[in-house]
């Protein structure tokens, strides 16, 4: 199969040796041989100096001639016609070069910068002796397209509507319908737009360079076939002279992979009807609000078995996923990256189309419908966003104009050894602006409620995952990536200024200080941070046989030492159920009963621990196998009442978490947590209070061994003289698949001092279970 690059190369004129057999054509007035050769061989960097309307000086005292030159390789005939279709001039071919030229009548309107003064009628061979006629305005009759302010903001890295400035804009220019193409490629020798409308021939539509900014532009009228739905790319002659064919960095629509072309997006905006949600989402995402996130890989959440296991599109996902997630009581859906990415096995974490939802699941408007349906169901939408690195696919950003434009030239700064990807040059204004504009595209134009920024740790440290001789210190000799810090601070500041109520979340796996501190206090400015330390410590604890847990008691307690140093989300994410790590259930020790009991206890511990919640799909019903992005979760397990019990527990945990302020209002404040028993290593028992803003407590007791414990005394605070505490949740309940050992729904308060409190309760602790009590 011939690629776009092969086709574009194949359409070049004959080699010089073959062309030398034909006599050189006579040159039209005002054109020299070198310029003609550069045009016909695709090397012309300034096409507007040759093509379109021009004034030619004549003998002294005579009126200057007005001529038109048009380049249409393969055309039989080209005419300049007036708006009524009358022939103004027959353009003569310049040999077999594809260039046509002719003189406009002296009384014709001035065509320079006024495309309506004439049109071009091009006659093409159509096979079997037939002809095809194409009529359109001349792309080279249009004046400058982008305004000075646009170019200034692009150069400064502050054009937040970049996808409405660069790229492909279906629009009217000088009252002519068509598509305005623009791309930043400051070091290219020549840039052309190629696509369905010009047979992917890079000689046909070379673009104009706006000097000083590195932006190339061209308006292609609709009469030439350019419009919404047209496939296109940019063909460049790089700084090194090599031919490159690149997808549009700011394309708002793409072909479905493995195809790699960009697609002209529909200019009509989506008609949103989620104003009520947008006005209230700030309150739904504050630190004192309940946030329970269901993490989803859109391509594998559910497969269409009747259609060969095909992934669902956005509309089908909206019908199935949204009611499922809302029915379980989650507050948010978090989508693994949906920006266009060439390799499905990257799960979206190696994107190249940072402004376009992946065409795997439908057009951009289908994604907008999905988001709106989430909002109608009172679900927030968080999208994973990847500004840390990008893949080196030849159609992408790598050496975009023949130089290291988006990345660092030095591989010690620009190459990520773990992922074989390239690292953005955060010190370059245009690159920072490109990335921030991408973030705003998702938040402003797709109404996304939050961005989870991937791999922040890899951005913050110049020596991240590198040996000592493979990194470059910063200007102070340190390991901190100061340019990345400045970028993250600027990104967060701009997002919060332009998108009220939207949140940003950092996946940051180190102890970098102030990730969620305000930028004005030298923090990074994120709203939340994934608590990777809590996740690793607690999972390691739960993986141990209960008989050994007494020796690793701090696996569950240590997280409280730093639980309020940042605003945390507790993540049981996709990263913990892949690459041989097994599923959450698979990590639990013991026989089938013990594994399920361990999982239930762990989920309840997480839901009652300070911090917002995140759970990856499949974890909510105890999937047996680890996640496979080519297959759906093991939904058949819900035929087993034990797995339905885990799912029921997640539903009830969400309901309790959302309804009880003590469990969420102070998730990020130390006043919302107090240990009662944190040192009972021998029994692996933990007891703690969660408190709302009024100080009203809930008591959580966890027994992390399979040994039931009767008569376990726990000190409790005096709450308005209450004489009993109610059992609000017990993970050993029969409805969850447990043994149904508990306290009959209530425990009495006794005037017996314990654990520093004047009063106490005696609780029956079921095996491998968590009990939640409330006055």
Swiss-Prot record:
GO biological process, one term: glycogen biosynthetic process
Catalytic activity: Transfers a segment of a (1->4)-alpha-D-glucan chain to a primary hydroxy group in a similar glucan chain
Swiss-Prot/TrEMBL keywords: Carbohydrate metabolism, Glycogen biosynthesis, Glycogen metabolism, Glycosyltransferase, Plasmid, Transferase
Ranges of biased composition (kind: Low complexity): 8-24
Disordered as annotated region, ranges: 1-39
Quaternary structure (record): Monomer.
Membership in a protein family: Belongs to the glycosyl hydrolase 13 family. GlgB subfamily.
Protein name, as recorded: 1,4-alpha-glucan branching enzyme GlgB
Organism: Ralstonia nicotianae (strain ATCC BAA-1114 / GMI1000)
Species classification: Bacteria, Pseudomonadati, Pseudomonadota, Betaproteobacteria, Burkholderiales
Gene: glgB
